[in-house]
Design a protein with these regions (language model features):
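Acyl-donor binding region in acyl/amide transferases
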Residues: 2-22, 104-106, 116-119, 123-179
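Acyl-donor-binding surface of acyltransferase catalytic domains
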Residues: 1-69, 73
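A conserved beta-strand-loop-helix scaffold within acyl/acetyltransferase catalytic domains
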Residues: 57-142, 156
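Aromatic side chains
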Residues: 28, 82-85, 166, 177
């Protein structure tokens, strides 16, 4: 395969709300409120999910707050966490905190030592709880906040009578916490 080129073409589709569930089950995920993209999404069946003892122990160290109101001070703190997160992961900054907020129905933020250290934005589509964005500041890596976030998302998803949690794309080693 000499002299072969790979052409990357981003592909998205605009859906009606009554189509969300069908497309979600086929591997599509919301990039924005209007545009969905095809991905290898990770899905947790809530009937089968059981957190480990380690996750339950770590979760006790973290205070969590479900919230739908966004104050300017909190927005600024979450933006700083997001900036640290994408820098730590080496990701490109293709979304702003405002994009994330507008593409969600609500969020959870996590407090450790009286500081907000992480957040998770979500939306609900029928019986599915979708993780829109999760980020943390990596100030205390031993907290394993990715695993703790999955646990708390499972509690909120069950409360909202969801059957599944979708945690967006799952590629490579950076998504191991989703498994």
């Amino acid at each position: 395969m000499r002299n072969q080129n790979i052409i990357y073409v981003p592909f998205g589709v605009m859906l009606e709300p009554n189509e969300y569930k069908e497309y979600l089950e086929q591997g599509w995920y919301p990039a924005t409120n209007d545009i969905w993209f095809q991905t290898r999404s990770t899905r947790i069946n809530l009937e089968l999910y059981k957190p480990t003892k380690t996750v339950l122990r770590l979760a006790k160290k973290i205070k969590y707050f479900p919230d739908v109101n966004m104050t300017p001070a909190k927005r600024e703190r979450l933006a700083r966490i997001y900036d640290k997160y994408i820098a730590h992961k080496g990701y490109s900054d293709d979304m702003s905190i405002d994009d994330i907020i507008s593409n969600s129905h609500g969020h959870i933020y996590y407090v450790y030592n009286n500081e907000i250290v992480a957040f998770a934005f979500h939306k609900v589509v029928e019986d599915a709880y979708l993780g829109i964005e999760f980020a943390w500041d990596y100030g205390e890596p031993k907290l394993s906040l990715g695993h703790v976030n999955v646990y708390y998302n499972s509690l909120f998803a069950r409360f909202k009578r969801c059957k599944y949690i979708y945690l967006s794309s799952g590629y490579e080693s950076c998504s191991i916490y989703k498994s």
